[in-house]
Amino acid sequence: MPIAPDRVRHPEKANRPDNPIQRKPEWLRVKAPTSPEYGETRSLMRGLRLNTVCEEAACPNIGECWKKKHATFMILGAVCTRACAFCNVATGRPDQLDPHEPEKVAEAVAHLKLEHIVVTSVDRDDLEDGGAGHFARTIRAIRAAAPGTTIEVLTPDFMKKKGAVETVVEARPDVFNHNLETAPRLYPTIRPGARYFTSLQLLARVKEIDPSMFTKSGIMVGLGETKEEVFQVMDDLRAADVDFMTIGQYLAPTPKHAKVDRFVTPDEFAGYVTVGRGKGFLMVASSPLTRSSYHAGADFERLRAAREAKLAGRPVAAPEATSAE
């Protein structure tokens, strides 16, 4: 279940000074979620006692996605064992694992008749396998309940626990996503519980195990990185043979989180698409509101078409930039 409203979500940030709230530019304004479909999706998640990253991470696209009955399921509980400076997911002592969660996720996928599903999780450094087995069971449960649904996983780094990546890959998701989140220079303050090159090694390992599996990774911009650092991240991801990169604007969930250094313009985001395509990515989704799972289903179809075109020696059509509409 989602975190109770009266629970302190980020006790480790409680004594930090507040950062000033910045007014968002017009291109980052979104409508409040009010559609009947939004309410139906929310009720289904509550009824099955499931968590979504859409709610827990305060995603700005929740109204649009839930109106379309698209949701990103967050497994392994609602409390994370790490405390990244950018993330709204609650931190602290993690929940007991729900052994029936894989089947509940599969039930929701079948009920919503989803063509493509994204499954992510909190970090569970307390578990022997980091939660990899739970990911694998969830993938298999979805395959059994909705065999026509394509599956994308967005995993933590599993703290380099032996066999964890192999366990997830062997369950055969269609896309394996693991986000770098930001440039390596910013890791000590933005992602202190993780290591940049550990994440790169994880992505490279996925391709070693199964070269046919699509891999994906994303970063946020507006945290103080330079364009040159973004280009270096692109090069590092391509060296790991990553197929698809996402780039979106960082938005501070609360005044206690890392401050927004600047709002990157839509033209700059479009420029990253051009550069990324030139570096060899099959797909680059880059816009102010781009998030890892935003338009994931449509992007998966484009990704598959891009690979087919490349293998056939045809020009790979450049995808349209992801809009905020």
Curated annotation (Swiss-Prot):
The gene is lipA. SUPFAM superfamilies: Radical SAM enzymes. The keyword 4Fe-4S applies. GO terms for cellular component: cytoplasm. InterPro entries: Aldolase_TIM, Elp3/MiaA/NifB-like_rSAM, LIAS_N, Lipoyl_synth, rSAM. HAMAP family: Lipoyl_synth (MF_00206). The lineage of its organism: Bacteria, Pseudomonadati, Pseudomonadota, Alphaproteobacteria, Rhodospirillales. [4Fe-4S] cluster 1 binds at C54, C59, C65, S293. This is Lipoyl synthase. Residues 66-282 form the Radical SAM core domain. Its EC number is 2.8.1.8.
